[in-house]
Amino acid sequence: VGFKAGVKDYKLTYYTPDYETKDTDILAAFRVTPQPGVPPEEAGAAVAAESSTGTWTTVWTDGLTNLDRYKGRCYHIEPVAGEESQFIAYVAYPLDLFEEGSVTNMFTSIVGNVFGFKALRALRLEDLRIPVAYVKTFQGPPHGIQVERDKLNKYGRPLLGCTIKPKLGLSAKNYGRAVYECLRGGLDFTKDDENVNSQPFMRWRDRFLFCAEALYKAQAETGEIKGHYLNATAGTCEEMLKRAVFARELGVPIVMHDYLTGGFTANTSLAFYCRDNGLLLHIHRAMHAVIDRQKNHGIHFRVLAKALRMSGGDHIHSGTVVGKLEGEREITLGFVDLLRDDFIEKDRSRGIYFTQDWVSLPGVLPVASGGIHVWHMPALTEIFGDDSVLQFGGGTLGHPWGNAPGAVANRVALEACVQARNEGRDLAREGNEIIREACKWSPELAAACEVWKEIKFEF
């Protein structure tokens, strides 16, 4: 008989420490926690096998294909410093294993089945290197950072946003009123909350209409281009596209999607529609913490961020470093660069396991949102730089004098920080002083500073 039946060790076939990675390979870095007694090589090889061509036993149809051409290979294993039984396993996948232009297929292959594998106690995908050949099969963001600035005619500063609260329960007319007040006060964008879709108290079409009215009114009065992220997320792809079409008919500049709950397939369709029809696309990452919060199991957010850049989105929420949600500064800045820059060098101190070349795929603006207020402005300006969107929900609507003064306070604080930075002042050291000086000529800012002077989200 030509083949030997039975179960065999994965490491015989899938652990190849002398393999030279190809420029066309997709490379993955997995944090592997093997079950007690399972050697790291076997665990790493098992990951490579289960996420590519392997199955648990030898099958005779293996003889009909060229395994060496199609198998994933675990080509390097290193222990994790400070962790007893954790290893980083590096796996190389041949490009032919993946459908072109499909983030869905890429994830189904790489993280589809292997996470339930018995030989592993836990598994986390830390990073992916997307080869140039594969990047080129994706459209990516509908427009990207530069085109967005040109469309909005806003340069040399971060953009300001605000999520309309209370997130659920307002009627469409009152919702539109809140949008108008924020935009009129000086924000660039307002935002539908991620769970505002089309509920009994406010159907999507009514909301779209009143928000468009608010936007045009604020635009006429301020002479600035304004936007409201109209959430097109829906229960079916057809309904989602219907909402995007209506937004386009209203002539608004931007729509929004929840890319993880909505799914990569729907998201990529929407991104194509947005590019074809001149709409910007704001992406919210609802559900990400389910996937990325555990340190030893799941997928790191930097991988979800890379996937979004491939699937398509012009903005994506990416933590604040300073607000109420978790995020370590260097690590956050690592994936912020992965979103914005064209070429990112490997840098383990920032969590970047591979050098990534995006070959001019448009960039994505990172959005800082969640528990931030005027006192954070110097830090945010310093950390995120100009190419970002800073979103203050409660930090605008919680202003004691109302929404418009709340918006004024944020805009004044931002302009003061940008001016100070341009004059060469050190925002990290003089931040509080810069905000205090600005308070002198903005009563709105002074009132905001008073309200939030004691708030800290430190746990």
Curated annotation (Swiss-Prot):
Binds 1 Mg(2+) ion per subunit. Mg(2+) binds at residues 191, 193-194. Keywords: Calvin cycle, Carbon dioxide fixation, Chloroplast, Disulfide bond, Lyase, Magnesium, Metal-binding, Methylation, Monooxygenase, Oxidoreductase, Photorespiration, Photosynthesis, Plastid. The record marks 324 as: Transition state stabilizer. The modification N6,N6,N6-trimethyllysine is found at residue 4. The disulfide bond which can form in the large chain dimeric partners within the hexadecamer appears to be associated with oxidative stress and protein turnover. The active site is at residues 165, 284. GO terms for cellular component: chloroplast. Its cofactor is Mg(2+). One of its GO terms (molecular function) is ribulose-bisphosphate carboxylase activity. It is found in: Plastid, Chloroplast. Substrate binds at residues 113, 163, 167, 285, 317, 369. It catalyses: 2 (2R)-3-phosphoglycerate + 2 H(+) = D-ribulose 1,5-bisphosphate + CO2 + H2O; D-ribulose 1,5-bisphosphate + O2 = 2-phosphoglycolate + (2R)-3-phosphoglycerate + 2 H(+). The modification N6-carboxylysine is found at residue 191. Its EC number is 4.1.1.39. GO terms for biological process: photorespiration; reductive pentose-phosphate cycle. It comes from the Eukaryota. PROSITE patterns: RUBISCO_LARGE. InterPro entries: RuBisCO, RuBisCo_large_chain_AS, RuBisCO_lsu_C, RuBisCO_lsu_C_sf, RuBisCO_lsu_fd_N, RuBisCO_lsu_N_sf, RuBisCO_lsuI. Pfam families: RuBisCO_large, RuBisCO_large_N. The basic functional RuBisCO is composed of a large chain homodimer in a 'head-to-tail' conformation. In form I RuBisCO this homodimer is arranged in a barrel-like tetramer with the small subunits forming a tetrameric 'cap' on each end of the 'barrel'. RuBisCO catalyzes two reactions: the carboxylation of D-ribulose 1,5-bisphosphate, the primary event in carbon dioxide fixation, as well as the oxidative fragmentation of the pentose substrate in the photorespiration process. Both reactions occur simultaneously and in competition at the same active site. Belongs to the RuBisCO large chain family. Type I subfamily. Heterohexadecamer of 8 large chains and 8 small chains; disulfide-linked. The disulfide link is formed within the large subunit homodimers. This is Ribulose bisphosphate carboxylase large chain.
